[in-house]
A protein has these predicted regions:
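C-terminal secondary-structure termini that scaffold catalytic or DNA-interacting sites
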Residues: 10, 187, 197, 201, ...
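Non-catalytic DNA-binding core/recognition domains of DNA-processing enzymes
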Residues: 33-49, 61-66, 78-95, 109, ...
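Basic, Lys/Arg- and aromatic-enriched nucleic-acid-binding interface segment
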Residues: 74-87, 97, 101-161, 165-166, ...
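Short, polar N-cap/turn motifs at the start of nucleic acid-interacting alpha helices
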Residues: 103, 170-178, 249-251, 270-290, ...
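Short, basic (Lys/Arg/His-rich) helix/loop patches that form interaction surfaces
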Residues: 132, 136-147, 157, 193, ...
Length: 343
């Protein structure tokens, strides 16, 4: 009997438990369609299976599921409640399609029914003055070289944090100046990115900080055979912002570094199709089907202009005369900030 047949070895009278059917769904759907299925599986193992795992699938009601979501909402975990709802809706819809269930109890519910409407998309991007503070602030904290240079590389390459910390050393050809990321990204599209001199400085620093026998660009300090956890660089940003003598600028996240890079590309008049290629977003309209050009020369030119702009910012002696929010407005740090200066 095959492993799948063993999982699906129960009668067709509707007596299968949630746990039995969810194990099949994980194997046949979740593992095949999710880029990071382990995140979804962890959420199911923590919040769903302990509560309703042993209940017969055909006994699950909308009320019972809402009680499960409400536990998370009552704890203030709105995002997690919405994530669990989305997973449950996907699972019960699949179970209905497969015939394990006559009708999904969540078919008429929408994501906004759990915890209200989604929060609006973030709009935070760092100003020139804040980029200076971010870059030089990294040198003032007692953090690992991996975190310090990985965060800088996130900004310079406009990559998602996961794409940097899960990069392998053999993806980088420093002789040709290209990062061949392949399909290891959110959209699973094959992607290559030209590397600027400033980005190569970051990569060389990460190579120097990585044990020779590790395949990872940013290995974990606890086990060099594993990549650094995404939470590590996220925590660094939080520490720098929340410390008594912190950066002194408005809160931002690692993902906001990517938004900062994209906004910079626009300010440098980079054509939208080139910027989209750098971000690894699909082209718009019919171009997404017929335009197969790799755009590497155009991306190289755009990224070099972006890198030169960043270098001009970080080479400034201070942040006083760097642009901040509006023309003529300058950044004022609180006196307690480690980077506070007097004119």
């Amino acid at each position: 009997m095959t492993p799948l047949a063993k999982l699906d070895d129960f009668d067709e009278e509707g007596n299968a438990t949630v746990r039995q059917v969810i194990n099949i769904w994980i194997r046949l759907s979740l593992m095949l369609t999710r880029r990071r299925p382990e995140i979804a599986v962890s959420s199911l193992m923590k919040h769903v299976l302990p509560v309703i795992g042993d209940v017969p699938l055909n006994k699950i009601t909308r009320l019972r599921l809402n009680r499960l979501f409400n536990i998370l909402l009552a704890e203030g975990k709105i995002s997690e409640a919405k994530r669990v709802f989305a997973l449950c809706k996907q699972f019960f819809g699949w179970a209905e399609t497969q015939g394990y269930l006559a009708h999904s109890p969540l078919s008429s519910m929408k994501r906004r029914d759990v915890g209200g409407r989604n929060t609006p998309p973030r709009e935070r991007a760092l100003t020139d003055a804040e980029i200076w503070v971010f870059w030089h602030g990294l040198d003032l904290w007692d953090i690992s070289e991996q975190c310090r240079w990985a965060l800088r590389l996130c900004l310079l390459t406009a990559r998602r944090p996961d794409e940097v910390i899960r990069a392998r050393k053999d993806e980088f050809n420093l002789r040709t100046g290209v990062w061949r990321q392949g399909t290891r990204n959110k959209s699973a599209r094959d992607h290559s990115l030209p590397l600027t001199p400033l980005a190569i400085i970051c990569i060389n620093a990460l190579f120097d900080a990585s044990p020779k026998d590790s395949v990872w660009l940013v290995p974990s300090p606890k086990d060099a055979q594993k990549p650094l956890s995404r939470g590590a660089i996220t925590q660094v940003i939080r520490r720098m912002l929340r410390a008594g003598r912190g950066l002194g600028i408005d809160a931002f996240t690692t993902r906001d570094l990517r938004r900062t890079a994209r906004s910079k590309l626009s300010s440098l008049n980079v054509p939208n199709d080139v910027a989209r290629k750098i971000m690894n977003h699909s082209l718009e309209g019919i171009d997404r089907v017929y335009d197969t050009h790799d755009y590497l020369p155009q991306m190289k030119q755009a990224l070099e202009a972006f890198s030169d702009n960043i270098k001009g910012i970080i080479d400034a002696p201070d942040y006083f005369d760097l642009r901040h929010k509006y023309e003529g407005e300058f950044l004022e740090l609180p006196e307690i900030s480690l980077l506070y200066m007097e004119r």
